[in-house]
Amino acid sequence: METDIKARAKNIPYSAQKVRLVLDLVRGKYVQEALTVLKFTPNAAAGPISKVVASAMANAEENIGVSRDDLYVYKIFADEAPTRKWRRFGARGRFKPWLRRSSHITVVLRERE
């Protein structure tokens, strides 16, 4: 049975829609290749994603003893986190809602044989 190595980051201050654009670049790649792609991706969400991938890689080495050269990104996804809401003043005495969306990032690695 294959073991899944997981890492998760919660309440990342980027919307899940924007994070998913970057996640699609690294899904299915080897971990070292994924970190290189994230390093040169000009998107603000690439920083937290690379930290989560590196954390999952460290979990695999420390807890299970798997070589980092054999790991690949099996699953990676972003879910919506709580949205911070506040009101701005609009025309005619109305309020306009401002939403600051955030996301949870989950990375699952597996060992490729």
Language-model features, listed with the residues they occupy:
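Structured, basic alpha/beta domains of bacterial-type, RNA-associated proteins
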Residues: M1-Y14, L21-L25, K29-E113
